[in-house]
């Protein structure tokens, strides 16, 4: 395998680019700003792998590309960012399989029942189907479509879905499009679709023609292989896709790496992913960091002030398997020390998990959030002010964004019930990657070394709420 070439994009690009360069990987298709920052032109050849901020979630990195090269990039980033959670798509995106379908176009891939998008199905029909949507998170559904594609550096050939030419959204010049359409004409006449990737606009025509022929030959071999293949046989590997849920701990590591390239304020990446107002504050903070120190305490003060202005915060509780839950919208009532005081009221009956105590309408639920700490304190009271229990959720560093509080749950928790402190759900530690497990154990030990501090903060929060009545 040649040295992987990687394209990096998004708010983490500078830090990620430095990590990859320092580990001996090559960069490709660099933005002008990134070239200036790192003093590196990058390879003129197109990338094998793209690492970018997710379009859907600024706390996530998306790593996608040719499987072998992508695995190398994932391995490299894991070393530098050990506390983040990787969600590898299964099976590979755009991988292709020989499958047998029934009359309703259903099939089984492994143990999972899948519906295949196809023009015509009958019981026992064998066909080649592409994975057009992989399973990344627990609620994701696998989607397949009849036909397949083969992917090159400059183009993709799509087989079994008609003919024609399509373009990357980054190819906009009409003259370039006309040239690429003419180059694809011969292959399209053979009944296939050509999709030109963004890298095609910079390549020499002869290079593009050679790749089209190479891809067509590969597609022909796949069809020959599929003739005698059994149901479930993979005939094309597709692209590796890894969605990385970045923890605060790794964002801080990326801050340190970025600071070796350009001035970087504390918690740069956490604030940058927190919302537009926070991102604007980062621009100013980085400029100040170029000439003087920006203290972490000042960042915490800024976040608390901003959260108070927000009035309400949604608590987003993420799990290591990728599941995500909203604990509800809480009213910001102020702060005691460095803790935001959030208030909710129960509207129905239920049970407080972990405490094994009945939840009733009118119960007061206080949540105490200390930005960047590794725990949340939840205190529960009945409508008469009697304590039902205290629940301390141990998690990755808490990030307070514009309208939300977010973290990854580390499974183990601490409770105070009937005058006693205890640790619960310790068996959940086995589900954590080793670095996160070590964080969780250390945090539990730290919290249990001064439980009176938890009670003190809760008491101060109650005083604040009482004073506002």
UniProtKB/Swiss-Prot annotation:
Keyword Nuclease annotated: yes
GO process annotations (BP): rRNA processing
E.C. number(s) listed in UniProt: 3.1.26.-
Signal peptide region: none
Class in the EC hierarchy, top level: hydrolase
Name of a matching Pfam family: DUF402
Alphabetical keyword list: Endonuclease, Hydrolase, Nuclease, RNA-binding, rRNA processing
GO molecular function, one term: mRNA 3'-UTR AU-rich region binding
Family, as annotated: Belongs to the FAU-1 family.
Function of the protein: Probable RNase involved in rRNA stability through maturation and/or degradation of precursor rRNAs. Binds to RNA in loop regions with AU-rich sequences.
Name of the protein: Probable ribonuclease FAU-1
Native source species: Ignicoccus hospitalis (strain KIN4/I / DSM 18386 / JCM 14125)
Upper taxonomic lineage: Archaea, Thermoproteota, Thermoprotei, Desulfurococcales, Desulfurococcaceae
